[in-house]
A protein has these predicted regions:
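N-terminal loops that bind phosphate or other acidic moieties
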Residues: 1-45, 49-270
Length: 270
């Protein structure tokens, strides 16, 4: 299941609501998959509009987030600052007991789901701080280590599913949180291809601090370094240091011409 297709930024780009967006749609797809016979699910994380610690998924599966007075919390990440416990009286046990593999697109921690990715989901100033506090509270209630890498992916979605596994199975053995970049690279045979290459060229629109936290470009440059293969990065702009060969696009001519010129610049640096 591609989480971005159900809970993604593209569908709501013109009406971002970082405080109240949720992952409910992904939960609906999980429940539907179980009724169709699925026993394990792979979730491709990334590109979500929500920062809700996966509570939307839990809600779709019948759980309910409650405050200390026993009242159900409104949807979204912001209300989680009042999270006291999660009610499981109506939980869809069959769907909850599926095996989950979560392919994360970032090594971000739960708090970084808000501080690093909140702004691109529309969060500003105090909203970022509020969502960061909400992630900490969700970690506290679910027993999640707030410093866990990858648990900030997709708005903290691994937090809720790991809690689900602990609740139903007594451990998180039925939820695997993996580096999506590393997983896909292995499936494509990239480690072997990069090791036998003379040069690797990769890139993205903007190279910044997020690029090296589990994104494709960071995964590829890591593999190249491990193999001792020279690596060059082409990007529209560079806002973070790297020891790779770099070539920003010139913004002159067609895109094809810019890419060709940038590739030439990398070759000249070798």
């Amino acid at each position: 299941i591609d989480v971005a297709s159900a809970t993604g930024l593209p569908a709501v780009q013109d009406s971002l609501d970082p405080l109240h967006a949720d992952s409910y749609g992904t939960g609906v797809l999980i429940a539907d998959a179980e009724t169709r016979g699925a026993t394990s699910i792979v979730l491709g994380l990334g590109g979500t509009a929500s920062i809700d610690a996966g509570m939307g998924i839990l809600t779709a599966l019948g759980a309910a987030a409650h405050d200390s007075r026993g009242y159900a919390l409104p949807k979204g990440g912001a209300p989680l600052v009042q999270l006291d416990h999660i009610d499981t009286a109506q939980l869809n046990i069959k769907a909850g007991m599926l095996d989950f593999t979560l392919l994360a697109d970032t090594r971000a921690t739960p708090v970084q789901a808000a501080t690093m990715y909140g702004p691109q989901k529309g969060a500003k100033g105090e909203q970022v701080a509020l969502l960061a506090g909400a992630m900490l509270q969700a970690c506290e209630v679910t027993g999640t280590d707030a410093d866990s890498a990858y648990y900030g992916a997709a708005g903290g979605l691994p937090i809720g599913l790991s809690w689900l596994s602990h609740t139903l199975w007594g451990s998180d053995e039925h939820v695997r949180v993996l580096s999506g970049g590393t997983h896909v690279a292995a499936a494509l045979g990239l480690p072997e291809k990069i090791a036998s290459a003379d040069l690797v060229i990769t890139g993205e629109g903007r190279f910044d601090e997020q690029s090296l936290t589990g994104k494709a470009v960071g995964t590829i440059t890591d593999l190249a370094r491990q193999a001792g293969t020279p690596v060059g990065i082409i990007a529209g702009s560079f806002e973070h240091d790297t020891d790779a060969y770099c070539a920003p696009l010139s913004q002159e001519g067609s895109l094809a011409q810019q890419l060709a010129a940038a590739a030439g610049d990398i070759v000249k640096q070798l």
